[in-house]
Amino acid sequence: MTDKPDLTSTTMLRMILDYAGSVDEAVELVRKYDLHDSANTSFHYMVADSTGKSAILEWGNASDETDTDGTKRELKVYYNTDDTILGETEDANKFQYITNFIVTPDYYSDEKDMKGLDRYNAIESKINPDGSNTEGIISAETAMDVLELVGRRKWDASNGESDKNTITVWSALYNLTDKTVTWVSNEEFGNEKAVFTFDFEYLK
């Protein structure tokens, strides 16, 4: 905790969308605030812009076992152009991705506590299966396939789990060049009534 103003995570996201025109501007904005821990948990988000730059923003402290005081959490920023610390695969790739675990090294003492690690690895394997697509350039169709692959209900079912209450409520594919977004509700990728495309013409 510092003398910076407190900010909740949802308000922070709204602030970035309203006032940041690039990754650098987003990071500059976020650094002006302390993230208020209303959910008693660590946080991370990823931001990107139309230049291809991205960054993972993580708020944590020490380790998963001791990270219980939100006032002690600090922001760490990992850019896609400088994330060697995250691992060899992340260093080789020029694209980033996150699921439901903190990517900061040594945060977890046991890999089983890294919730979503299996889906994290699946994303990389789908985008860069043979190691040659380090730029992460894929078609919109393939990007949607990735989102469908790692939806919680489908993923759990394919791995022998049957919690029917687990589902990815919505998935979205953003085209930061064309300023469009394709939005899918409740993993219903094959249902045209559940797939919506929005064109943010006013941003062009």
Give the predicted meaning of each segment.
Residues 10-37:
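Short N-terminal edge-element motif at the start of the domain
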Residues 1-18, 41-43, 48-204:
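C-terminal, well-structured catalytic/ligand-binding subdomain of enzymes
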